[in-house]
Amino acid sequence: MRHLRIMSGILMFALLLAFTGIAQNKYVGAKFCGACHKAKEKGEAYAIWEKSKHAKAFETLKSKEADDIAKKKGLTKPASESPECLKCHVTGGGAATNVEAGFKKEEGVTCEACHGAASGYKMIHNKADGKEKAKAAGLKLNDKTDAKPCQKCHNDESPTKKEFKMAEMWAKIEHKLPPKK
């Protein structure tokens, strides 16, 4: 009887792990998004991102200044390898276990930092009836009134913190879809 309870507990735990693993979307990377979202009719989102500081976020970690900041914070690895830095300079924090093959940390802070890991919605979000299905599958549609996603990194913990002004920041990354004709 004791063994049955132990085995039941192990089985329940294994099932819980299996189902939470299935439900977790993976990051696909900006290049995947860019395949469609470069186009004018898609709001040129990829081009806007490519010119942004977000696209260069990982690159900044390769600088002497970033390594000096990391040392000052007591980190033993270079900034470009430190989880404490990667959590804000790479979408998904550089966690290699939650990514698809095309994902590259060198892309920095990508579409998925705001819109959620895309593996669950990448093939349905642009279909005629896909928006609601995509949202149910993990797509996040943010707007200029919601600073929470931004403030996960733009906050007092950042060693290079600057005053966070949502309206100004939003204007730099906003990518509206053109009205449908």
Where do the model's predicted regions map?
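Sequence context of c-type cytochrome heme-c attachment sites
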Residues: 19-106, 119-144, 164-181
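Short cysteine-rich clusters marking metal-coordination/redox-active sites
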Residues: 33, 85-88, 111-114, 150-153
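Short Gly/Pro-enriched loop/turn and capping motifs at secondary-structure junctions
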Residues: 118-119, 158
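A contiguous, mid-protein "functional segment" used to position or interact
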Residues: 143-158
